């Protein structure tokens, strides 16, 4: 019985050892922008606005922007970090009252499709949904974040702050802003 246990333990430890990842030997900052100085260089489709006493890129309402980064250099990993403000009536995985208008409010981050690292389109974009909607009884517009679409999580799941001031006004203005 001991030999079997030791054999299983050795097999299990070698499995974990082979699944280890290499250490990151250096960090190189490639792009940084607080937008406070109105700098939109290397950005197409971006506009600036003020929210909560700071300058932000946006509002986008069914649109987006592109950041062009040249001469990134050879790398094994890319770490992307930013503050994402979700304003107004994002309805997550389910949007609209009629069967024809029930399409998700998707948020997509895409990387250059010609990257030689991956040829599978699933690896060069991150697609998820967000919901700022409240839940009432059985009525709850779920979101996918922090998972990929079409996962189902409660509204505002994973938000850093879900009670920031309201930016959008009017009938479809929705609730407060959420920060991710």
Annotate each predicted stretch with a short phrase.
Residues 2-9:
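Sec-dependent signal peptide recognition
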Residues 20-180:
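Beta-sandwich/jellyroll recognition modules and their flexible linkers
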Residues 15-18:
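C-terminal motif of bacterial Sec signal peptides marking the signal peptidase cleavage site
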